[in-house]
Amino acid sequence: MVKFYTYSGETAAEALKIAQSHHGVDTLVFKTQEIRKKTLTSSGLYEIVVAVEEESENKPSKAPLIPESLYDEELNEEDVVMQLSSTVEEMRKLAGVSSSQRHYSFSKNKTLLEKDAPLEDAPLEANKQDALLQALKDEANHKKEREKREVKQEEEIKDINLQLSKIRDSLKLIQNMFWDEKNPNSINIPQEFAEIYKLAKQSGMKPSHLDEIMQLSLELMPLRMRENSVTIKRYFREVLRKMILCCPEDLNLRQKRILMLVGPTGVGKTTTLAKLAARYSRMLAKKYKVGIITLDNYRIGALEQLSWYANKMKMSIEAVIDAKDFAKEIEALEYCDFILVDTTGHSQYDKEKIAGLKEFIDGGYNIDVSLVLSVTTKYEDMKDIYDSFGVLGIDTLIFTKLDESRGLGNLFSLVHESQKPISYLSVGQEVPMDLKVATNEYLVDCMLDGFSNPNKEQA
């Protein structure tokens, strides 16, 4: 016999799913109707009536598919099929099935009924496919909407950043309204240059060099570039970059290279020499043979410090006293690619001891002399040191303790005035990592944006 069961859900599909969970996927849907429409405050409600064929205890024969209450004396098979067909049609409308997908006509329904095939299988399968397609379309539409919103948000953020930049420039102009700085030649420094002028002045740059840069900028910088602080700083950065000289590291050795480090006491010559030894022997693509000679026989612990580094790096080290011994050790280290010479630190005012170093340099060997200076030294003292050690024939400059200085204006001024190139920079105390080949770009960045250790940034 056939029994009828009623199930409800927020959607027709949900109600059908509940019915199928009780009676199986082949459940015959007899009727579907919308009880309550979905609103903003309440969910929809659909009711579905299913017909289930159950075995009767008294009647083993198959029960009719249509309830007896629906039979009429005039009701024939054609009317039953019509009623079932209209029920299926109503389900299609509720599930959103288009007319093009209605491929089960009245005649086909009749044929299926005659063959005892379940009428609901094909429409339900079509409903599932349509629901899946609709879900995919909805997801694609949602994705497009999200992308549009994200693009719009990015444009709004860019616009906000642009407005903030304009506000910052306006504030700087307001702050500099009372700016009345003049250089020694009574040339007014425009308000637009106030920020960069103060920054360069605080760095320790020689005033005459700074005024020279300002004068050059006023003459050459287009007016349209003075609109905001960013373009002014960019232009000033380029001027500074051209102001100093840096020499690239020369590793094309046709013969052994002898490098002597000279300079005052306490600038870090010995530590810098250890960094160079490690760099040449271990840190480059080619591992060069390195030997060390020290002339520092006066400072307590100097030889011990260098010997410790030399033993760690498995390289020879010799201490010499006079030019004759120096020549012998140079010959003994003939097999080396680099010979590094450490010297005793001398005051720039001790002309006699500085002149004593010249005996070693004038021994007939091609020696590159590097003056080691600390950027913590003010420009006036730095210039005195350079002038005093200049008698040795300075080839390059090495600057140390960049991590201990707040400004590099003194460095820029000395290099600009001496026209000597910078070879290396010591950016920290770690051996061997904190040694960097000097570049214009890095020095300008440190001066305008503050010091940064490239080794720690990479880590």
From Swiss-Prot:
GTP binds at residues 263-270, 342-346, 400-403. Gene3D superfamilies: Flagellar FlhF biosynthesis protein, N domain, P-loop containing nucleotide triphosphate hydrolases. It comes from the Bacteria. Keywords: Bacterial flagellum biogenesis, Bacterial flagellum protein export, Cell membrane, GTP-binding, Membrane, Nucleotide-binding, Protein transport, Transport. One of its GO terms (cellular component) is plasma membrane. It is a peripheral membrane protein. GO terms for molecular function: ATP hydrolysis activity; GTP binding; GTPase activity; signal recognition particle binding. One of its GO terms (biological process) is bacterial-type flagellum organization. It is found in: Cell membrane. Necessary for flagellar biosynthesis. May be involved in translocation of the flagellum. Belongs to the GTP-binding SRP family. This is Flagellar biosynthesis protein FlhF. It comes from Helicobacter pylori (strain ATCC 700392 / 26695).
